[in-house]
Amino acid sequence: NPTGCDLTPTQWAQVVQVVKTRGLVAFLDMAYQGFGDGIAQDGAVIGQFLAADLRFFVSTSFSKSFSLYGERVGALSVVCGDSDEAARVLSQLKIVIRTNYSNPPTFGAQVVATVLTTPGLRALWEQDLGGMRERIRAMRQALVAKLRTAGVQGELDYITEQKGMFSYSGLSKAQMLR
């Protein structure tokens, strides 16, 4: 999320309730899973939607978390109510896919699949991802320290409380020019 502000589990529960009450179909974008609090923690929202017995889409990108930017590696998962519905959805997805591309590149997908299905490689990848996550946190702390040194007044803790690669700074133009 480009603001760095993630919903709390309580806020997600409210979103789930609205989706359920209104009969909506949610689309969850997991482009930065693992950069916030960890792979499982960042993906916990999926469990909330599953527990509510909802139908929804999950778009997962591996371009950032695997540093495969040029490969554009990702997946679309669709949670359906039963196998008949899944078959109908798959049929429609195949039509959409066929009109967009016939043979997508496979190198990046093979790299991701190999890492995720090889326990030693997966553990190493998760360790590296944790290192990236900690570096982002350290950079946020350094930014706040530099802003304080530059004389920026006011509350800045929200910058270190935000997660991931993006941050909504809330700084004015004058503060940015310091």
Predicted regions and their residues:
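Active-site-proximal structural scaffolding
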Residues: 8, 19, 39-42, 52, ...
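Active-site phosphate-binding strand-loop segment of PLP-dependent enzymes
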Residues: 1-35
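Alpha-helical subdomain
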Residues: 5, 34-43, 95-102
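Short, electropositive alpha-helical surface patch
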Residues: 14-16, 43-56
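Conserved PLP-binding catalytic core of the aspartate aminotransferase-like
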Residues: 124-177
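Conserved core segment of the aminotransferase class I/II
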Residues: 51-126
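Amphipathic alpha-helical segments in well-structured domains
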Residues: 12, 42-46, 90, 140
